[in-house]
Amino acid sequence: MNDPNGLCFWNGFWHLFYQGYPPEDPRQHWGHAISKNLIHWEDLPYAIYPNPEGRCFSGSTFVEEDRVIAMYHGTDAGNIVAVSTDPLLLNWEKLTGKAVIPIPVQDGSPQEYTVFDPCIWSKGGKYYSLSGGTLLTKPGGLRRAADFLFRSNDLIHWEYLHPFTEGDIFTLVGDDGACPYFWPIGDKYILLFYSHMSGGQYLLGDYDKVRDKFSVFSGGLFNFGASTPSGVHAPSSTPDGLGGVVTIFNMNPGMDTKGWNQIMTLPRLLTLEND
């Protein structure tokens, strides 16, 4: 068991998906568990199987009135959208049967964006998605965390807009922006993500909905020490409906484990206090 994915509330249950695989197919699938209280969980059959992608990596969900949308990274393909309408989210249909945001062709030229772990939301009748990754810094060729913004009318055809965050002085050179989740919190917005170098992190700021930019004014770590082996890693989060954000991380059980055999944390409720 590895990253938690797609935490959401649907039809009276909390749903948590996660990277896992059955004994007969050692490729990442999306496992699935449900809970009434975020503490006691019941495991369900695997929700999403890898095809045509090599493996189902991390992603998020977006709940609409009549369906739940999942968007995740499929290795060797790109970012994939699947939808479900049934009461327990047991059955998922992948739109188009292929990646809706394919991995760019590597031809040696500079890349505008990277395609990796996505999150998804809607605004003004359109869908928006972040793709986690890095930006090349100059001089020196070092990389910094970045998340790249895409927009779509129909979940199938996506256009690339630009790097999403501005004013980030809180992440370090060498961080990346994997497993992003972007949600309102209080009267601000929070971007949660995972750096393979520094562990779970967040950025806090204002969402300029005209320019589609995230102006950052604060940030921090979810670990107060080393991120491995016992720190928290990838987040999965969803709004609580009251202005807060519920988040679950994965973590090693206090020691190094083989094959990313990890555990999930207790849920954290993130809220924004007045200055």
Where are these regions (language model features)?
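Beta-rich carbohydrate-recognition and catalytic domains
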Residues: 1-117, 121-173, 184-229, 248-275
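Repeated scaffold domains used in trafficking and secretory/extracellular systems
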Residues: 57-59, 178-180, 232-235
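Structural secondary-structure packing elements that flank or coincide with functional cores
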Residues: 238-242
